[in-house]
UniProtKB/Swiss-Prot annotation:
Homodimer. The lineage of its organism: Bacteria, Pseudomonadati, Chlorobiota, Chlorobiia, Chlorobiales. Its cofactor is FAD. It comes from the Bacteria. It catalyses: 2 reduced [2Fe-2S]-[ferredoxin] + NADP(+) + H(+) = 2 oxidized [2Fe-2S]-[ferredoxin] + NADPH. Its EC number is 1.18.1.2. It comes from Chlorobium chlorochromatii (strain CaD3). Keywords: FAD, Flavoprotein, NADP, Oxidoreductase. Binds 1 FAD per subunit. InterPro entries: FAD/NAD-bd_sf, FAD/NAD-binding_dom, Fd--NADP_Rdtase_type_2, Ferredoxin-NADP_redctase_2. Transmembrane segments: none annotated. This is Ferredoxin--NADP reductase. Belongs to the ferredoxin--NADP reductase type 2 family. One of its GO terms (molecular function) is flavin adenine dinucleotide binding. FAD binds at residues 25, 44, 52, 57, 97, 132, 298, 339.
Amino acid sequence: MTLNHFYCSIEEEIRDLTIIGGGPTGIFAAFQCGMNNISCRIIESMPQLGGQLAALYPEKHIYDVAGFPEVPAAGLVDTLWKQAERHHPEIILNETVMRYHKRDNGMFEVSVSSGHTYVSRAVLIAAGLGAFTPRKLPQLENIEALEGKSIFYAVKNVADFTGKHVVIVGGGDSALDWSVGLLKSAASVTLVHRMHEFQGHGKTAHEVMEARDAGRLNVMLDTEVMGIDVENEELKAVHVQSKNGKTRTFPADRLLLLIGFKSNIGPLAEWGLEIVDNALVVDSHMKTSVDGLYAAGDIAYYTGKLKIIQTGLSDATMAVRHSLHYIKPGEKIKHTFSSVKMAKEKKKGMQNG
């Protein structure tokens, strides 16, 4: 995805909707703004759009998005952006939203880390899990010099592991996915999990055990990493110990720690909104307790919430739709099918051309 056509905001230029967060939910919200004929801006703290998919898992394959039997994370982000960019949303990158203020006239001011303030008629928070930092193994100390070289917390580039002896730690979806995903390119893969059973998707867990039974993958359950050997700032081996006290050492070039992330919603926690499970409580329209202020995706909490990409896209659709009542008060809200709207726009483009 190229970003060279994005432009910076004029501080007081009013948009209909400010979208906080440029992950899949935020990008799709921008598309929905275009479909509903309202202007928007996305404010994203990272240097690129895509959220965790772009920052942590660009080469991870996703299987549970409707219409995509299988799609790499970066490919999904590109497709979502291609869908949204036709409506020319304004994009603000490398800016963290710090606070908001609702004016007496109902307008929202959103202030960012650089000191700029952006104004809109409504706000949609699509900040995912907020700021996230990888969980580390406390028994591995002073490893900063190895991080990004021999020790990783995500797979951003498969080439980093090609031809290497890889030890993966974890039992969730990411650990299982990459245990299978790296088999074709790595010299060897060893999966170490401290529990007796995996917590990831059952289908992938079955694939992991099949690979183990076929002798393609080494799986160590009820086992923890206890230490590492390093020479000249390069990883050489990983030491593990099982619950029965048995110790083993594996030659290793790469240690991939996939044991989750700590999330922090940061300044949003100080906005006076109701928070449950580190997420903002919303109603059935994705509205918070403040009129005109919405939340969608992983940052939104409601009974029965499922934190997957698919529900985030649905949340965004409902939030944008309901925001029209606040952005265009008194106007009758009409639904236009996407096929009809796109046909009209194509016809208009041909006439203007």
